[in-house]
Swiss-Prot record:
Source organism (scientific name): Prochlorococcus marinus (strain AS9601)
Bias (Polar residues) ranges: 165-178
Ranges of compositional bias, category Low complexity: 150-164
Keyword Cell cycle among record annotations: yes
Location in or out of the cell: Cytoplasm
Superkingdom of source: Bacteria
Phylogenetic lineage: Bacteria, Bacillati, Cyanobacteriota, Cyanophyceae, Synechococcales
Listed name of the protein: Cell division protein SepF
Amino acid sequence: MSLISRLKAVVAGDEYLDDDFDELDYPSEDELNDINNFKQNPKNSNALANSNPFDFMNNNRSSKVVGMPGISNSSSEVSLMEPRSFDEMPQAIQALRERKTVILNLTMMDPDQAQRAVDFIAGGTYAIDGHQERVGESIFLFAPSCVNVTSSSPEEASPSSVSTENTPQYSLGKNTTPEPAWGNSKLSAYS
């Protein structure tokens, strides 16, 4: 068959040249027998109509429950990290995702890299609704949302934390927020 005759056949709508077949799904004999048996036995339809739709879910619920990884009621983990470069920061984010508290000691890093690291981890902590505190000079605590971070300082009468039940608490000596490297100057444009 030539190319022109094939084009004419396609444009004219000759279906025998189409390689696609209509595949109709006809019920098998077993399926037909099941349908006929169900129609003949009205007890099945009444039982289905009178049944509670929530019973099915309650019966199978215990088999579908899956525990969250990294959560344990007995203890909590704290990861102490002393990174030397920014390349080690994804490990801290992974620890936060595993619901571990991370203490970063950034004294070994270049100040610019340390600021970048704090910003990166602070963003990850914010994304998981966690908490962050500055513990000391270049030392920061980042905790997931399941951990209460309580700070006690003489200036504050009440702890600065979000309380939830059955979560471990870590106390810090002082509540100060991290300052960016460019915020070290005491000058203000509005003074």
